[in-house]
Regions:
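Positively charged, aromatic-enriched patches within helix-turn-helix-type DNA-binding elements
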Residues: 150-220, 225-227
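A general structural signal marking secondary-structure boundaries and capping sites
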Residues: 43-44, 72, 121-125, 175, ...
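Residues at or immediately flanking beta-strands
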Residues: 2, 26, 76, 136, ...
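Glycine-rich nucleotide-binding loop
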Residues: 35, 226-230
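N-terminal/domain-start alpha-helical segments
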Residues: 1-125
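Residue-level signal for beta-strand positions within conserved beta-sheet cores that form or flank
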Residues: 23, 73, 140, 217, ...
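Short, Lys/Arg-enriched segments at the junction into DNA-binding effector domains
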Residues: 2, 116-178, 182, 233, ...
C-alpha cells in the first residue's frame, strides 16, 4: 500500500513516514500543492491514500483536495490539520475529503483510520447493511452507477465523491428505514469522533440538491424530527407522515 503525505512541517512529515513504513506502507512526501499534484500524476504504481495538511504554502489543502477530486473521485483522502473549527471541517468535506483529524493527534487512531479507509476502498460492498444494491440503481428520475460514482438525472450528470456515494448507497440499502444521525456516522464514516451530526446534514443537503426536484420539499430523503432520515425510493404521491421537517 502506498501513501502520499502532504505536509510542510518536515519533522512531522518524516515522523509520519517512519511510523507508516514501520507498518509496512510505502510512503512518499510532498511539501506543497504543486509537488503533491505532480507526484500523484506521475505515480506508478498509483497511491492508495493521501494524508493532507490544510495550511500549506502557496496552495491550500482545500484547493489540493478539490484538484484531486477532479482527477479521481475514489482516492481516499484524510485531512490532518491544526484547524479545529467546524467551519474548517465542513469546508474540507465540501472539497471532498473522506476523513478529518485534528492536530495534535494520537498515532494509533491515525493508523486505525488509514486502515479503515483502505479496507473500505478494497471492499466497497462490505458494509453492515441489509441488501447491497446492483451496480446500477434507479429511482424516480435518478440513475445511480455505483462503479463509476456517477449520478444522472433528466438533465445532469454528477460525479460523486466516495463519501457522497457511500451515503447514498447506505440510504438505498436501507430503503424505508428510519436511520439516526449517529447510526449514519458510525456506518458510513466508520470512525466519526471528529465528525459532527451537522456534517451528516450537510451531505444530505448536497444529495438532495442532486436528486430532488425541489430540495426544500424532498420526496426521497426525508427528515425524521429529532432522529435522522428516512430514504424512500418510491414515495407515495401524497407524501409520508414521518416527513415532519421538509427542508431540514
Amino acid at each position: 500500500m502506498r501513501i502520499l503525505i502532504v505536509e510542510d512541517e518536515i519533522t512531522l512529515a518524516e515522523g509520519l513516514a517512519f511510523n507508516f513504513q514501520q507498518e509496512g506502507y510505502q510512503v512518499d512526501l510532498a511539501s506543497d500543492g504543486p509537488d503533491a499534484l505532480e507526484t500523484l500524476e506521475q505515480a506508478d504504481p498509483e497511491f492508495d491514500i493521501v494524508i493532507l495538511d490544510l495550511m500549506l504554502p502557496g496552495m491550500s489543502g482545500y484547493e489540493i483536495c478539490r484538484e484531486i477530486r477532479e482527477r479521481d473521485v475514489q482516492l481516499p483522502i484524510l485531512v490532518l490539520s491544526a484547524r479545529t473549527l467546524s467551519e474548517d471541517k465542513a469546508q474540507a468535506f465540501d472539497a471532498g475529503t473522506d476523513q478529518y483529524m485534528t492536530k495534535p493527534f494520537a498515532l494509533p487512531e491515525l493508523l486505525s483510520r488509514v486502515r479503515n479507509l483502505l479496507e473500505r476502498r478494497q471492499r466497497p460492498d462490505n458494509n453492515n447493511t441489509v441488501d447491497s444494491p446492483d451496480p446500477q440503481f434507479q429511482f424516480g428520475n435518478v440513475s445511480v452507477d455505483f462503479l463509476s460514482f456517477q449520478l444522472t438525472t433528466d438533465d445532469d450528470v454528477h460525479n460523486l465523491t466516495r463519501i457522497e456515494m457511500e451515503l447514498l448507497r447506505y440510504f438505498i440499502e436501507h430503503d424505508g428505514m428510519v436511520l439516526t444521525r449517529h447510526q449514519i456516522l458510525r456506518d458510513v464514516w466508520g470512525e466519526p469522533s471528529e465528525i459532527t451530526t451537522r456534517s451528516t446534514d450537510n451531505f444530505v443537503m448536497r444529495l438532495r440538491r442532486m436528486i430532488e426536484p425541489d430540495p426544500a420539499q424532498p420526496r426521497h430523503i426525508l427528515s425524521v424530527r429529532g432522529t435522522g432520515y428516512r430514504f424512500i425510493a418510491n414515495p407515495d404521491p401524497v407524501g409520508n407522515s414521518l416527513q415532519s421537517e421538509p427542508g431540514s
